[in-house]
């Protein structure tokens, strides 16, 4: 069984977009099941512990994004999830907010990219108004090769929706991607199947299929695809 951690803040589901978020989580769950041929269980972030993952016989952990900023979470609610991912007991893939969870779990500060300059136009004023951000399907410059990045070319198009970023690379990880706005886009652990992306590969489309390729590569190398 795969575990897909719903990293959405518990207050978000009471908001007007709560049902859309849940629908998106279910769609991603089905995509992971279709890619691997295995079952996938959605578990809320504040319920994850190593004991639960062992009880579920989890084969891997996928961590969703979130509409909330990282500083809105109670650190106590993330202890179990942080303990699980840093134990290196399971393959882990963090998407956007999940990437930021990984960064924090491994000791790296996460903070806003920064405010727009006075002469900069805010092209997406309904998303993090006044802040530097990335939003939409945009190219990611790959800075070095890795088996997980096979088939992506030099600048795959991925879905972006973030105004926060990891401010450094965690120990035992390397960064494999960058953009002009945010230099840390892909963290891959040097010895364990742990990856995080600041973007959303799980929102791949027929027009922009690179996210599917990346997730498939991870699932294949982690031994998650049933033959």
Go through the PLM ranges and name each one.
Residues 30-94, 106:
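Flexible gly/pro-rich beta->alpha loop and the following alpha-helix that scaffold active-site loops
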Residues 99:
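Catalytic nucleophile loop
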Residues 102-103:
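Structured adenosyl-cofactor binding patch, chiefly the S-adenosyl-L-methionine
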